[in-house]
């Protein structure tokens, strides 16, 4: 039995992960935490999320005493916190010997030079960063098992990389073009005008400047063009990706590349059949559908995930179970 502390449990991702861990026979929840300044401190989780009324846990402030209690009682800590907050908390808990599963972007780049540009801060813990593993569960299981610092991928990168990584040996130098739509939960729980009921509408954002673009490119080993879109639905991501493959590539070659997922229970791959967001919402699954034109050499692959599940909480749970061999 492994004991897990969840910090940032009041947000969509933290609450979703709480529900997932609560349902696991081999995991227990050491505690749920929010910042000392949070208006949610002291509230039962079910006050914020009535659908979790079966989870009788209260949100505690992350005081120094609480941090010491976590170190004494927990085997691992999950951080569903802002990037700049995770930066410091992850390094501290790692230094105390706990396994850290960070859902922010604070440890996703191995190159410290990326952080000022994409996250607005200098990375102060290069020695911890050097130990961090990118937690793309289907691809980095051995590394996840071997380290105590796991950077859980972003939602768009999870959808995109799951679709693209099998194709690496078939790609030309042409940039893959990724157009992806996410539900509004991807913007977080905080009230914002552009995600309010009357304002939300299908629109691109972060064009040629979203921080997930270099995350995808770094993990793929090739530059990409990535355009995210805000959709007028609650949860889910659909990424439609167009790539040029090497001359002479056949449909059979593409099918062989995607056979890498034959033993991956959470990834479904279909040829000439494309996924729907509704089919993956509230599941830990990724559905891929692809079609290849041998004459032009272009392939289109669509990837559907739940942004709060496979794109965040359920992938964190995958990483926890891989790390602890559960």
UniProtKB/Swiss-Prot annotation:
Q: Where does the record say this protein resides?
A: Cytoplasm
Q: What metabolic or biological pathway is this protein involved in?
A: Amino-acid biosynthesis; L-arginine biosynthesis; N(2)-acetyl-L-ornithine from L-glutamate: step 3/4
Q: Which residues form the signal peptide?
A: none
Spell out the reaction equation it catalyses.
N-acetyl-L-glutamate 5-semialdehyde + phosphate + NADP(+) = N-acetyl-L-glutamyl 5-phosphate + NADPH + H(+)
Q: Which GO terms describe its biological process?
A: L-arginine biosynthetic process
Active site residues per record: 155
- GO MF: N-acetyl-gamma-glutamyl-phosphate reductase activity; NAD binding; NADP+ binding
Gene Ontology CC entries for this record: cytoplasm
The alphabetical list of record keywords is: Amino-acid biosynthesis, Arginine biosynthesis, Cytoplasm, NADP, Oxidoreductase
- Transmembrane region positions? none
Top-rank EC class of the record's enzyme: oxidoreductase
Out of the domains of life, which is the source? Answer: Bacteria
Q: Which Pfam families match?
A: Semialdhyde_dh, Semialdhyde_dhC_1
Q: Which family, according to UniProt?
A: Belongs to the NAGSA dehydrogenase family. Type 1 subfamily.
Q: Which PANTHER family match?
A: N-ACETYL-GAMMA-GLUTAMYL-PHOSPHATE REDUCTASE, CHLOROPLASTIC-RELATED, N-ACETYL-GAMMA-GLUTAMYL-PHOSPHATE REDUCTASE, CHLOROPLASTIC-RELATED-RELATED
Function of this protein? Answer: Catalyzes the NADPH-dependent reduction of N-acetyl-5-glutamyl phosphate to yield N-acetyl-L-glutamate 5-semialdehyde.
- Protein's UniProt name: N-acetyl-gamma-glutamyl-phosphate reductase
Species per Swiss-Prot/TrEMBL record: Shewanella baltica (strain OS195)
Q: What does the organism's lineage look like at the top?
A: Bacteria, Pseudomonadati, Pseudomonadota, Gammaproteobacteria, Alteromonadales
Q: Which gene encodes it?
A: argC
